[in-house]
Amino acid sequence: YLLCGVALFSNVSIALTNIFLVPLTLVFGLRLYKKRDDWRRALPGGWMNISLGVLLAVLLVVSLFSPEMLRSMWIVLDDFGYRMLGMYAVLLFVRERRRLAVIALCALISYTVNNIVLIGQGVFLGNLRAAGFSFYMIVGSMLSMVTPVLLILLLSGRIAPPYHSVVMGAFAVSLPAIYYNGTRGAWIAIAVTLLITCGILIRRKKKFYIAVFCSGITVLGLCMVSPYLSERIASIGDMKMQSNTERICLWTSAFHMFEDHPLTGVGRGRFRSEYRDHYILPEAKEGALPHAHNNLIQMLAECGIFGALALIFFWGSFVAHGLRLWLRRRNPMGLVLLAVMMGFVLHGMTEYNMGHTNVVKFFGLLLGLCLAWIRADDEKECCV
């Protein structure tokens, strides 16, 4: 029930999500205290366990060299502990696919409700950076992770009839939400993720190429009737646009932090103060920015080369697991896991979505649902 509550409010309210997440944390800790051997089940398994352990170890070690050692360590534990609790809790507590489906349905309801509100803001208020109950960059990450997943589930033909119409409706709502949200980084992340995952899933490549062509024609037609859309797409490569030039300034400053502290970085959670006080470029127009608008560059600046490599290893282990599952067993959940990872990582190339607590919580929940479903499939095969 607590996991259903977390899922149901995951896209709507941080406060309401925490009402369920805090007691879930207590129940999770109590379960591990009473049944100490269960900690293995709460972990994703295989190389993903190793990569998670390496990432935590590296980030905690480099935090020892941070000017704010305790604060940096706390941020590390919060990032990959409390915020990712959804993954650990789903893996520990939920074994039946029926219950996993209920939690996933709650998450889908939350996602769709926010998208409906977002579309209403766009249609009736003329808001072309609409966000529903949230912030437009946060919604961009949610759309990047979920939209490809919905299409993969529809194309795989593995959804039970009662849920098929629900998934179809959620996907249909996602499309105008993508438009009215207006996050360019999310548009790129969704397009690339769909191209790769659907290209892998669809065996008849002729159908895939026709679908890509028709999608391109549709987008071109929308650009012709919507000046906003055409201008927004054209602005992606416009180096005179402030949001683009500001990102270049941020990335340059972050690289300077890395040059000065190549091994351990400036300290986890210290980007804002270091950027403002020491590394802001003269041409930068926004001096109080708290992050680098890029997950990997942020990690490189704050935790050095070791932190960045550990993060790549962590991401790569999940991507490899998804690909391996599809290639060996043709299990669509492998591509679902791949889509979640790609959506999060690709949107994180233009936004520091690791810094948005509700994005990371939702990301962890999605990973937990994917991995628990895969584990349930494995256990069923073993029983047979």
Task: Please give the residue ranges for each predicted region.
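Alpha-helical transmembrane segments of multi-pass inner-membrane proteins
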Residues: 6, 57-60, 85-89, 95-126, ...
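Transmembrane alpha-helices of multi-pass inner-membrane enzymes
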Residues: 23-31, 212, 333-349, 353-384
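Loop-to-helix entry and N-terminal half of a specific, functionally important transmembrane alpha helix
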Residues: 1-6, 170, 290, 323-350, ...
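A membrane-periplasm/extracellular boundary helix in multi-pass inner-membrane enzymes
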Residues: 176, 180, 201-243, 250-260, ...
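Transmembrane signal-anchor hairpin modules in multi-pass inner-membrane enzymes, especially those
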Residues: 1-75, 95-99, 105, 153-165, ...
